[in-house]
Amino acid sequence: MSVLSDKSIRKLAVEQSMISPFIDKQVRDGKISYGLSSFGYDARVGDEFKIFHNVNSSIVDPKEFSSDNFVTKKSSDYIIIPPNSFALGTTIEVFKIPRDIMCIVVGKSTYARTGIIVNVTPIESEFFGTVTLEFSNTTPLPAKIYANEGVAQFLFLKGDQSPETSYADRKGKYMGQTGVTLPKV
């Protein structure tokens, strides 16, 4: 597997709509950067979040997930994640991953250096949709996540050949997701 460069990412974004909307360069302007980078793409988080809380003393169960476990917040500026807590968000960008590509996502250093961990599971070949982002506040302090700014870098890996079975072929349960998507079994 090889990591795609900015040239390859740009070509796939323009010719195959791999990333939409696609920002052809790094944008800063007083914001946490987003857009095309040397060997990846810095995606933005949208303005809707699900912030976990323990008001009802419930248990988080991925097989029987309850909406009592979180509150939904919409903000064009930022949200605050309580200390040692967790939130979900979604990318502004829609991703359409080609059959011979997979994607690994890592958090941006700006957030990592403030105790915010951005986690995303691997994005498989032929996935299509927005990507749900997981934020963990590992600090004993409240932490801000800025809406409509960069949060994670997507690294695109090209396989030595196309897979026998893609995410689309398997009819993956998160295929075509839009917005913050909760766990499915």
UniProtKB/Swiss-Prot annotation:
Write out the entry's keywords from A to Z: Hydrolase, Nucleotide metabolism, Nucleotide-binding
A Pfam family this chain is assigned to? DCD
Q: Where is the signal peptide?
A: none
**UniProt record, GO biological process:** dUMP biosynthetic process; dUTP biosynthetic process
Catalytic activity reported: dCTP + H2O + H(+) = dUTP + NH4(+)
CDD domains of this UniProt entry?
Answer: trimeric_dUTPase (cd07557)
**Top-level class of the enzyme under EC nomenclature:** hydrolase
Q: Which InterPro entries match?
A: dCTP_deaminase, dUTPase-like_sf, dUTPase_trimeric
SUPFAM superfamilies for the chain: dUTPase-like
Catalytic residues in the record: 134
Tell me what organism the protein belongs to.
Pelagibacter ubique (strain HTCC1062)
- What's the protein name? dCTP deaminase
Q: Which domain of life is it from?
A: Bacteria
Give the EC number(s) under which this enzyme is classified.
3.5.4.13
Please list the residues that bind dCTP.
108-113, 132-134, 153, 167, 177
Q: How does it assemble?
A: Homotrimer.
Q: Name one GO molecular function term.
A: dCTP deaminase activity
Q: In which pathway does it act?
A: Pyrimidine metabolism; dUMP biosynthesis; dUMP from dCTP (dUTP route): step 1/2
The residues forming a coiled coil are none
Per its UniProt record, what PANTHER family does this chain match? DCTP DEAMINASE
> What's this chain's function?
Catalyzes the deamination of dCTP to dUTP.
Q: Record's family? A: Belongs to the dCTP deaminase family.
